[in-house]
Amino acid sequence: MARVKTLTILVSANGYGHIRRQILIARELLRRFSDFRITFALTDKQYQRFKLDIEALGEMADVVAGVTEDSVRWRHNPENYTDANLNGWETEWKSHAKLANSDFVISDNLVGVLEKRPDAVLSGSFLWHEVIAAYSDRNEACKRFVDREISLLRQNVPKMICNQSLASRAVIGLTSPVEVSWMIDDIIQQQTLALRRSILVHGGGTRTLDCKVLEIARKLRQANFKVFTDLEDDQDCFDYRDETWRTIGVVVCRPGAGTATECVKWKIPMVVLRDAENSEAEFIAERLTLLGLAHGLAGDLDSDQLVDLAKDAMAIEKMQKYIAPFENCRRNGVVETTDFLENYWKLSELAK
């Protein structure tokens, strides 16, 4: 009987797209291999948000919560970055022998893993040094972080699973990219266009655009639209349930990879809420605009102009035009990723 193989999945603290895609990959791995134990290393908040999804994976999946609390995330104030909140997670992770010494490691956007585990497979469509570099001349901790991440990547040239539609220049240039299509789970039934009458205004989970989100939501509500936001204290905080996604006709958002993936899944056009200081957000917005999936990138649109764009996308007679580009999106990324891991780690041979 084959020995149970262990996999640790480390997940960046920034937003929910990271953990959502890793749950899909874990589910497909466990579907193929019964002798596989997967442990997620998450923040407490990620665990609470996705507890039921992880439990649904069965007894071969578990969680160590709190490990990645002190991992890099987007902050508008460069003075708020320290060595501790950029790299502190590494000490916590290394203290858990079960995590650090597992047979395999996937790290979603946390490059520091390569120091202990140069064999780790990275996952994500951008690298954190691309974003933090904007603050390198104002904060020594940021400069050290950027220099170290680039050095680790050049030394190890790791495999990195990335969305072929969104992969950044640094991912392509500094890693050995494994380009896959959109990571969409089971094919779901789409709602009739005429019934998709709600709007989601979403700041991307980083909390840096909350005031803008609230302003746009207020104006859309004044125009009698049903509006959800990602603000926890809002009267209509979005619950991310399938039945709620089915009601959404347009998403006004700072388009991170996670939000973009959900919009591709549900075929929901996006109106871009810009975050000009964040190079990742701007790059993704450009890519989505080129693909015809997002609108409003040109110029620096004010909230009234963004509201008008959202209204236009919600017009019944125009909805099909906005949705048409989504038909060109390939959605097999979960299977493609698992195929790669199965071959790269020789899992079929190990199972014999």
What are these language model-derived features?
Residues 124, 129-197, 203-206:
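A nucleotide-sugar donor-handling region in carbohydrate enzymes
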Residues 259-308:
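Catalytic binding pocket for nucleotide-activated donors in carbohydrate/polymer assembly enzymes
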Residues 4, 11-13, 36-85:
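Conserved nucleotide-sugar phosphate-binding/catalytic loop shared by glycosyltransferases and other
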Residues 38-45, 161-163, 226-230:
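Short internal beta-strands
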Residues 309-352:
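C-terminal amphipathic helix plus adjacent low-complexity
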Residues 228-265:
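Donor nucleotide-activated moiety binding/catalytic core segment of transferases
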Residues 21, 25-28, 184-233:
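Conserved catalytic-core segment of nucleotide-activated headgroup transferases in glycan assembly
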Residues 71-113:
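Conserved nucleotide-sugar donor-binding subdomain of glycosyltransferases
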